[in-house]
From Swiss-Prot:
Renumbered residue ranges of the record's region N-domain: 1-101
UniProt keywords, alphabetically: DNA damage, DNA repair, DNA replication, Endonuclease, Exonuclease, Hydrolase, Magnesium, Metal-binding, Nuclease
Family named by the database record: Belongs to the XPG/RAD2 endonuclease family. FEN1 subfamily.
Family annotation (InterPro entries): 5-3_exonuclease_C_sf (IPR036279), Flap_endonuc (IPR023426), Flap_endonuc_arc (IPR019973), HhH2 (IPR008918), PIN-like_dom_sf (IPR029060), XPG-I_dom (IPR006086), XPG/Rad2 (IPR006084), XPG_DNA_repair_N (IPR006085)
Keyword Glycosyltransferase: no
UniProt-annotated stretches for the region I-domain: 119-261
Record's protein name: Flap endonuclease 1
Length: 350
């Protein structure tokens, strides 16, 4: 779900960019968010995902492989950040997601029986699940491609934001806005999936382009601090209090945080029964989440044999397509990445 602050973000705080804007910049991508996008977007006409001969889903690997190569061809230094163990207070949201997916599976089966291909595709996308096996396969593929990834101790967006704050990454990338609450100086949206996309439940297609939101510009436009932004998110609803506070929408929440300059006192004054957990605990989590400095960002030459083994021999990908893509990846590495690496202290803070 993530926190949805889109409604209160002024147009002047959102900058539409092209991929050239990110050339030679390190972008920390929320891996789970990207993989879910690949799982939902890369599907057959009837809504079923791509699969190999053993019935194993491969949409996530296809998206990860080809999209990563495309980004690297633009000289973008991609690093994927994977979620670790979620905090206990996320339990309600996790259970809600399970219920939504289970219901979507039932509706998908009903749509298939009725021959309603549009509905079947929609519900199939909603039912997409990312398994531990899929995540491990993604990590193995990234290793073979020479692309770095980081294992977060908890929330991937918190880790990506931390990396951006300390200068190891230029921006965090996700469809959700949580990384802004976690303090990322920049958020890039629409990076994993761009191009012409169909709007949900409509026969309308729009051109999706990357967006850049800078935290300082956003806070200045709203006239609030990051701490107030966190309080605003909690009022609306986050992964740790999915329902937010009854009767409070984004615009009302913004008025409240601006009227109460102290976000702690504002949260303390809210009815406790509105929250599944202490709102101050949620507030503190956004400001000081578990993160790690145990990572090294290094872009290596791809291991062609290993990539072939994973995709072609392991998952029935087209040998010719993989071979051609590997040539593109090798060229991108030679042109943009050879000798490029960043250690734990980011070149001693540059």
């Amino acid at each position: 779900m993530g926190v949805n602050i889109r409604e209160v973000i002024p147009p002047e705080a959102i900058q539409e960019i092209d991929l050239a804007h990110l050339k030679y910049k390190v972008v920390a991508i929320d891996a789970y968010n990207a993989l879910y996008q690949f799982l939902t977007a890369i599907r057959q006409p009837d809504g079923t995902p791509l699969m190999d001969s053993k019935g194993r889903i491969t949409s996530h690997l296809s998206g990860l492989f080809y999209r990563t190569i495309n980004l690297m061809e633009h000289g973008i230094k991609i690093v994927y950040v994977f979620d670790g163990k979620p905090p206990e207070m996320k339990y309600l949201e996790i259970e809600r997601r399970k219920r939504v997916k289970s219901e979507a599976v039932k509706k998908y089966e009903e749509a298939v029986k009725k021959g309603d291909t549009k509905a079947a595709r929609r519900y199939a996308q909603m039912a997409a699940r990312l398994t531990d096996e899929m995540v491990e396969d993604a990590k193995k593929l990234l290793d073979a491609m020479g692309v770095p990834w980081v294992q977060a101790p908890a929330e991937g967006e918190a880790q990506a934001a931390f990396m951006a704050r300390r200068g190891d990454a230029w921006a965090a990338a996700s469809q959700d806005y949580d990384s802004l609450l976690f303090g990322s100086p920049r958020l890039v949206r629409n990076l994993a999936i761009t191009g012409r996309r169909k709007l949900p439940r409509k026969d309308v297609y729009v051109e999706i382009k990357p967006e850049l939101i800078e935290l300082d510009k956003l806070l200045k436009a709203l006239g609030i601090t990051r701490e107030q932004l966190v309080a605003l998110g909690i009022l609306i609803g986050t992964d740790y209090n999915p329902d937010g506070v009854k009767g409070i929408g984004p615009k009302t929440a913004l008025k409240m945080v601006k009227a109460h300059r102290d976000p702690v006192k504002l949260l303390q004054g809210l009815p406790r029964h509105e929250f599944p957990t202490d709102p101050l605990k949620i507030y503190e989590y956004f400001l000081n989440p578990p993160v790690t400095t145990d990572y090294k960002l290094e872009w290596r030459e791809p291991d062609e044999k290993k990539v072939f083994e994973i995709l072609v021999e392991g998952h029935d990908f087209s040998p010719e397509r993989v071979r051609n893509a590997l040539e593109r990846l090798k060229k991108a590495y030679r042109e943009h990445f050879r000798g490029q690496q960043m250690g734990l202290d980011a070149w001693l803070r540059r």
